[in-house]
């Protein structure tokens, strides 16, 4: 049996020798690179300055964490809160990581003394701070690239192909790394004249899988502009970084500081095997090893196979349970559903975050359920929408919002953080928007005093950009169908975010689409285009009509309730009143009296654009691309608006709305129109 031992050790030597032969001491050191981002300054005695100083001072008592990532903040909800993120390289020891972040923070605030946003890269860590929430938000600027070694001249194309192939492979591993660590290291195939390629990629673990992927793609695509075909390359951005060399510069996995180990039972198979081996002689030990190890390997493979099959079965059942007979099920939904699995959140996590959905945390209640404020353990504020368990339409909203918002990334769209399905529970988790919805400001006589023309004009422009993204710039063409003031959320800086995609319709952007029809007419009375309310006919012009209503509501401060009171105009709806005032040259009378400042020409131009959007014929309404041009270019001559929809004889929707419509039900509160399919 002695020859078996010799062969075994010789095989181990052959396996490990190449790695140690190529291992080199990493002398990778560089001077700190400070970046004072030009996005505003603060004064030395401001609230933000105090919060930032307290945050940096608190780092002296920072406790080491297993994953080298720190999400920090200081201040209350007054709007001057300081936020910070720290991240260390994978191989950095915990105490060294804390020391690096402490040093980086102190020096960054000295180098950028009055800058609201800044970032610094040290050899072993990165630290950044901001006056806005940065947790979970991808940031690719500023960037920094370091080049080492010589430029490739021979086999250049082959070199670049292998370089990009390795980085692409590592990107996928890192992006799928979960909420604690998004890191990957590895090597690629050799090319003529070179032994092997080595690389590492890393994202801040607060990013979603898609954001991590996009951040690294951005970095890869910027390689040609600075350092293509370089043997040594290091690239950094606030949210991700990567490194590429032709020598192994990183530690073996076994040499890295391990993640917190799982607790192993005392009577585990490994423990039993160790006990049995210690009671035998030398010859018996070899026999036992030769027998036990293969058995354990076979058992382990069998267990893994069972777990994989069970996981795939649960995954398939879960997918069918969520998709059901959704309006989006089919080729688009099936292909895209896998992208949403990383957004799953445990029900117990949401119960804890919302204090068991306590009434004190309830932000509002709607037709499909309630919305609660919550806080994740790391301090991130969230809004949790808990759908009613007995609402069929609530299920449709749930499916729509998951499948749509998982694809959409835009600053003027609300961001979906996750979702949960457990038994009858259906929950959606969004970013928390501090200032609630537009209707709570614009229709409140006191709160709308806070909205000067600069703020209102920013709202109009932001909503227009969000709709333009949905209609033309996203991967799919999306028609919202329920755009209204209560579905426009306002963040801390009063930027608008379009929310509630439960009624949205999705189409492949490559399809040519003029109008489509539906037998399920749903939306909010007063915002619905006439062709949609009467005949179920919808297109991008349906959203344009709703946008026009919103513009007029924002400027007048009045609700388009079709027959409600507008000052002394008790018998007229809002659109009729504004159009008549336009025709009679008394349009200044419709402007909200609280708008005492601001360009009257700009306000009147926005009213003009709003009237063009609410014209009765969809063909005469502009697209959102044209609306954006109208808002941004005064050289664009506006046509004369025609009579808006729902005036005089059109105030009441005719009873014979459509042969495919079974019935319309309207509630007295906000008059939401819904239709139920035939049994």
From Swiss-Prot:
Which GO terms of the cellular component aspect does the record hold? membrane; vacuole
Where are its TM segments located? 287-307
Cellular location of this protein? Membrane
Catalytic reaction list: L-seryl-[protein] + ATP = O-phospho-L-seryl-[protein] + ADP + H(+); L-threonyl-[protein] + ATP = O-phospho-L-threonyl-[protein] + ADP + H(+)
From what superkingdom does this record's organism come? Eukaryota
Q: Which UniProt keywords apply?
A: ATP-binding, Glycoprotein, Kinase, Membrane, Nucleotide-binding, Phosphoprotein, Receptor, Repeat, Serine/threonine-protein kinase, Signal, Transferase, Transmembrane, Transmembrane helix
Q: Name one GO molecular function term.
A: ATP binding
Q: Which GO terms describe its biological process?
A: response to abscisic acid
Chain positions found as Phosphoserine: 486
EC number(s) for this protein?
2.7.11.-
Protein kinase domain residues are 357-637
Q: Which residues lie on this side of the membrane: Extracellular?
A: 24-286
Region annotation (Disordered) maps to 260-281, 659-679
Q: Which residues carry this modification: Phosphothreonine?
A: 524
Q: Which Pfam families match?
A: PK_Tyr_Ser-Thr, Stress-antifung
Q: Which residues lie on this side of the membrane: Cytoplasmic?
A: 308-679
PANTHER family tied to this protein: CYSTEINE-RICH RECEPTOR-LIKE PROTEIN KINASE 28-RELATED, RECEPTOR-LIKE SERINE/THREONINE-PROTEIN KINASE SD1-8
User: What is this protein identified as?
Assistant: Cysteine-rich receptor-like protein kinase 29
Question: Which gene underlies this protein?
Answer: CRK29
